[in-house]
């Protein structure tokens, strides 16, 4: 006796169509187009999760550089001074300080300047 895949095929199709909900036109209605669109969107999401890390690091460095230059020091010299002073703050925290707590950031810049001048 031949057993067809009707129930399971419908279940599989519904799963992909559910993931394609909100897509425009045939991409949310027709299984084949929905499957292709969802696979592409999942690929972009995967790539985006990796790009997000680079983008945020770049943003943090830009913010630190801008704040350090306002206090008379370049980014590379500032980071070098902090390293010599033994201050181990990551770029995320430094960028947050540069935006939200400029007084504390200015103190860090002064510490970095002293360490650079001491060498």
UniProtKB/Swiss-Prot annotation:
One of its GO terms (cellular component) is ribonucleoprotein complex. Keywords: Ribonucleoprotein, Ribosomal protein, RNA-binding, rRNA-binding. GO terms for molecular function: rRNA binding; structural constituent of ribosome. GO terms for biological process: ribosomal large subunit assembly; translation. It holds the Pfam family Ribosomal_L20. Belongs to the bacterial ribosomal protein bL20 family. Binds directly to 23S ribosomal RNA and is necessary for the in vitro assembly process of the 50S ribosomal subunit. It is not involved in the protein synthesizing functions of that subunit. This is Large ribosomal subunit protein bL20.
